[in-house]
């Protein structure tokens, strides 16, 4: 089963790469390194997803958002990429933003409102793009910890900060 999931992520990654202009040799080397690291991380990610979201299915990976911000008097758009959206059997969608770190998140990072606002905006515009009730969408940070002694993956829910202030 993990091999099927890894193939799915590899295929999605290849599709995204095909959209890029890789004339720059440095960029190509960086992408190869990114792919190598992703393959090392995958075996840590799947068990954590299975633990938190039994029976999940992948809705999208690296989903691009390019939505007009209609609440402002300016002609602005939000552009971003949602790392992972999964759907669980209860009909809920879960937006996961992966963050890499060496020793976990410091208290200041956990309390950084801009980091939380990013997920709030992703949720708002994801719901608008797909016409989904915001009550059916929850947001999370997936922490990919890499240290000299061990590697681990943790998923930290941001629901308490973002759902109360939905529009």
Predicted feature locations:
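Short, well-ordered strand-loop elements centered on a beta-strand within folded domains, enriched
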Residues: 6-10, 59-60, 92-97, 138, ...
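A short, local hydrophobic-aromatic micro-motif
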Residues: 57-59, 120, 135-137
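Non-catalytic protein-protein interaction segments used by genome-maintenance enzymes to assemble
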Residues: 60-120, 127-130
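Metal-dependent nuclease catalytic regions and adjoining charged, substrate-binding loops involved
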Residues: 74, 112, 124-167
């Amino acid at each position: 089963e993990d091999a099927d999931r890894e193939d799915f992520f590899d295929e999605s990654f290849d599709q995204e790469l095909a959209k890029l202009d890789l004339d720059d040799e440095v960029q190509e080397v960086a992408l190869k390194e990114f792919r190598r690291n992703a393959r090392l991380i995958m075996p840590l990610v799947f068990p954590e997803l299975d633990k938190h979201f039994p029976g999940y299915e992948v809705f999208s990976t690296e989903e691009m958002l390019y939505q007009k911000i209609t609440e402002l008097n300016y002609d602005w758009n939000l552009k971003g990429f949602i790392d992972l959206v999964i759907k669980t059997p209860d009909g809920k969608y879960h937006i996961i933003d992966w963050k890499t770190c060496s020793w976990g998140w410091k208290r200041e990072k956990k309390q950084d409102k801009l980091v939380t606002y990013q997920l709030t905006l992703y949720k708002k515009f994801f719901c608008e793009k797909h016409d989904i009730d915001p009550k059916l969408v929850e947001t999370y940070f997936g922490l990919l910890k890499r240290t000299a002694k061990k590697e681990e993956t943790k998923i930290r829910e941001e629901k308490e900060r973002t759902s109360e202030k939905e529009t």
